[in-house]
Amino acid sequence: MDKLIIGGIEIKNRLFVGSGKYPSNEIIKDVLEGSGSQVITLALRRVDLDNKEEDILQNIPKDVILLPNTSGATNAEEAIRIARIARAMGCGNWIKIEVISDSKYLLPDNEETIKATKVLADEGFIVLPYMCPDIYAGRRLIEAGAAAVMPLGAPIGSNRGLKTKELIQIMIDELDIPIIVDAGIGKPSQAMEAMEMGAAACLVNTAIASSEDPINMARAFKVAVEGGRLAYEAKMGRESKFGNASSPLTGFLD
């Protein structure tokens, strides 16, 4: 069984969760418990060290890895500045690069993301860049020092599933780096499909936070991710155009 190691840390639970869109900060602790997640993303603007009631960190256990994102950055320079602030505020060395200048579809800018990744990796950050799935950009992110890459399945927050499935599969097959499917996953079955493809992990936020029962939805995604990974490691049987009997069709009545 392959281990998922990022930044020298073994990640045993391959479901990453986000912290946005929940009805209250208090529910996040229960979602983390239900999902078993070791990694949670958060926007820096939700960290308020001067107001504990509004500070999201008060609801995140100390053993959970913080993955602050650079939400709001429209270019590499802004992403770099946000990452440095996050580390200075005590959020650690992990950073999810988000560089989005497209306000309609919220698609990440791969070129600016590569620039930010290079600078931050050189500064000792564990960089996980959010990207449009592309084999060439993936290779350049690896060269820039990314610890993993996070291609989108569909536009962020859309719950539309794996619309970029074939492009993600190419990245899984060709890149020697953890591929974490991020954005667009709307159902546990879609997370399972991503894991069956060989994704190293899935990051889910909107699908859990916008459900009527986020805690049970977190549990559902946990089971789906575990099942999909187990199926991938078990090496699924080949598909066939024709029927193939599982029991002998001859000999019994001869």
From Swiss-Prot:
Please name the GO terms that the record assigns under molecular function: thiazole synthase activity
Per the record, the domain of life is: Bacteria
Q: Which CDD domains match?
A: ThiG
Task: Report the EC number(s), separated by commas if there are several.
Answer: 2.8.1.10
- Which residues does 1-deoxy-D-xylulose 5-phosphate bind? G157, A183, G184, N205, T206
Question: PANTHER family under this entry?
Answer: THIAZOLE SYNTHASE
The molecule here is called: Thiazole synthase
Q: Which organism is it from?
A: Clostridium perfringens (strain 13 / Type A)
